[in-house]
Amino acid sequence: MASMTPAEMARVLGSGLLSFPVTHFRDDLSFDETAYRDNLGRLADYKVSGLFAAGGTGEFFSLTPAEIDRVLRAAVEETRGRTPVIAPAGQGTALAVEMARAAEAAGADGILLLPPYLVGSEQAGLAAHIEAVCRATALGIIVYNRANAQLDERTLAGLCERCPNLVGFKDGVGDVELMTRVYAALGDRLTYIGGLPTAETFALPYLEMGVTTYSSAIFNFLPEWALSFYDSVRRRDRDAVYRELRDFVLPYIAIRNRKRGYAVSIVKAGMSAVGRHAGPVRPPLTELDAAERAELTALIGDRR
């Protein structure tokens, strides 16, 4: 069982950088639990405020429910209560409810509720989906606002009134006006998490809108760099932040944007570049080509 209340979990998450580890696969695309556990042990040396197991960077979309349970239980066992472990839930409402209950049974500290699969919906439908998951578990819920599941501030405020365990809002939209309206309406009722791809890009301006943390995929292969960058953001050291954006993050994004799906593929390529092979990505994702891998390795350079 989770050792934190939902409110306590949310406060902890908002206090530091968040880790979104990749999921390790063998060459035959099966889950490599030993390598996954070894990697979590390595990353445990670096202080983060939360670990999101089997999230987007962890290829949630390609994992079976049984595999998600294995990944999650491995993360809970390896962190040994030192770091809150957040589990994924998604797809349709019935499956999301099952995932949330399974995560609670596995010892997770919270749930990241991903958008429903494909279908578009009105605000009332999204609210019903989220409320059903909140009522299915005592764990704290973080709603992931993105794609086909974009809440407005009125819907979110109503959910917060009805669901005390709705404690987090992760933004994957990048709508500054919406974020301003949400924070103006709800203030510290929620913990706000930056969830755009390569979230470092938006971390400094988002800090001014109450977004005190973000999920760092780069942490997978450059943990010291990622923590240093986060520290610069929290200190509002504009010179340091924009130097690293110019010299590393923006060139990294240029590689990431070359093909669809590279937001995950480039992270595993980065791990290989620093000698921490995490195996292939699962279809429908594709690997970086040899020239792109060489370019990424050169960009990482002595930051490893």
Curated annotation (Swiss-Prot):
Keyword Lyase: yes
Catalyzed chemical reaction(s): 5-dehydro-4-deoxy-D-glucarate + H(+) = 2,5-dioxopentanoate + CO2 + H2O
Pfam family, one: DHDPS
Pathway given in the UniProt record: Carbohydrate acid metabolism; D-glucarate degradation; 2,5-dioxopentanoate from D-glucarate: step 2/2
Domain of life: Bacteria
EC number: 4.2.1.41
Swiss-Prot/TrEMBL keywords: Lyase
Gene Ontology BP terms: D-glucarate catabolic process
Gene Ontology terms for molecular function: 4-hydroxy-tetrahydrodipicolinate synthase activity; 5-dehydro-4-deoxyglucarate dehydratase activity
PANTHER family to which the protein is assigned, alphabetical: 5-DEHYDRO-4-DEOXYGLUCARATE DEHYDRATASE 2-RELATED (PTHR12128:SF19), DIHYDRODIPICOLINATE SYNTHASE (PTHR12128)
Family: Belongs to the DapA family.
Protein name according to UniProt: Probable 5-dehydro-4-deoxyglucarate dehydratase
